[in-house]
Amino acid sequence: MDDKFSVLYVDDEEHNLISFKAAFRRDYNILTSKSAKEGIELLRHNNIGLIITDQRMPEMTGVQFLEKVVHEFPNTVRMILTGFSDLDAIIEAINSGRVYRYITKPWDQNELKV
């Protein structure tokens, strides 16, 4: 049985998913998803403690994804990782309680440690 804390990372860029998993797999149970839709399914079938999502994705933004899951998974910590300056949407999401924190890309492994 795996007792590691579970983290879901959602990003449409495959190389980001690979890098994230490689950086954190020793300490955490890392689940990755290339889409928000797949991320929702992973949330429904796994005990996830932290969601980290990219802000800019094709089907919906990271903020929109977190808005979709906040009511079904209210106790899961939600963070946005972005390389862009979508600060208005992200700050609004933080202020409304949908997002705990945002981190800019490229991410620092020490900054992301839970």
Where are the regions a protein language model picked out?
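Short amphipathic alpha-helix used as the core "switch/output" element in two-component signaling
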Residues: 41, 63-75, 92-95
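As written
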Residues: 27, 62, 94-100
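C-terminal output helix
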Residues: 86-89, 98, 107-114
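Conserved acidic segment of CheY-like receiver
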Residues: 2-15, 19-24, 51-52
